Amino acid sequence: MQIHIHRHRIREITCDGTLSIDGQHICDTAEHSQYRPLVGNYRIVLRHNRAYGRKVPTLERIDSAKPSKPAVLAIGNGIYNRHDGRIILGTYLIPGCLKWSREPFKQLYDRINNSQRRGNEVMLRITESRQ
């Protein structure tokens, strides 16, 4: 399964984008500009996260020898106090803020989980618009 995050609005603090799977728009994304994952290709694995107390989609960088801090796809409404590289999912409200985050996250989690149980690899590609 190929997941694509395209960042289209990058400001001093906020970074907004869209998430699509195999070319179909799924939801919007928000990240903190200073702590966002680097542009590139990642493998998504489900790992236990102590902060959430459950398995969450975690990004593993595959196209660079330089290690980056592991980021996760997460539930949330805003990125202003997040300094851990989380990418939150939902419906765009204003720059850096999303609404209705739980349902898109649950759908994405289920798709990733089902794909991995079938033995398929889940890949994520992050791109940015030139600004």
Model-derived segments and their meaning:
Residues 1-123, 127-131:
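Cell wall/extracellular polymer interaction/catalysis modules
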